[in-house]
Amino acid sequence: MELNPTLHTKSMIVQLQTLIVDAFRYLSPLPQRSYLVIIDGLDECHDKATQQLILQFLCETITVHKLPLRYLIGSRPESHIRDSFDQESLYTVTRRVVLDETFDPGRDIRVFLRDGFAKICAKNTVLSHLEQPWPEEGIIDLLVQRSSGQFIYAATIIKFVGADLYSPPIQLALVLKPDPTALSDLDQLYTQILSVYPSSVNVVQVLGFIITIDTRRLPEVIEDILGMEEGELKSVLRGLSSLMEDENDKDGECLNKGVISYVIPNFAHASFCDYLFNSSRSGPFHVNLQEYENQVTIRSFTLIMQSIRSWR
């Protein structure tokens, strides 16, 4: 960055070329051993074109530039990603592994759940009266079964049950409450979390505008459009913490030009957006993107007109 301080403003390909390919050119000779680069959640990276561009570049680092790199890429098998891997350039240098039940994910999920609940108990001294280990093994068995091999299900449960300001036993009871109308256990979990949303603000509106505007570093834009007070969005999103990523800094704050500012967290998993966009799955929590795009346009023009009038 000292040699090229404007690098962060360049295209992704220029950045990758500079930071990876050009960097290896300074090494002579090249290392004899290969280095492993792990890329998880490729399907959640920006947009389809970007994802395919990343795969093309990674392929060229091996086939064209002959760099001593190996990649472990984790992704949902979206059609455009499968198409990229089916192209000859990638097909001949890759190996595919389907993470199905043969890998026994339930065993790892069980360990994850037991460890997560143990940490919740250690953090909440009020739970010391409960018989340990808490919860009982039968509940762990049920949660492992419901997870269907999906770690996101188990991770969301641990975040939901262990959320601050809530009673873990009550939160767990909500998770265990059956919903015969849910299409899947993950959908049921998402619906349950949104159903107990603690704020009086319309949760669907908040989610709809966050997805539509897509400006994580400008929460005040969403606050203006929703008519919120400054800082209110941060408070509102705390009620959705189990569905959001944990930021590097506490409460999603970041240092921006020497000033601590709030950054809207990303959703923890792409499956949550899939749930919101499908009305048959999310029901009353359905987010109609076209509707919110129209609302953003109308409300933005309204705010602009209000600002113009205030200048007169």
Question: Where are the predicted features?
Answer:
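Conserved NB-ARC/NACHT P-loop NTPase core of NLR-like innate immune receptors
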Residues: 1-305, 312
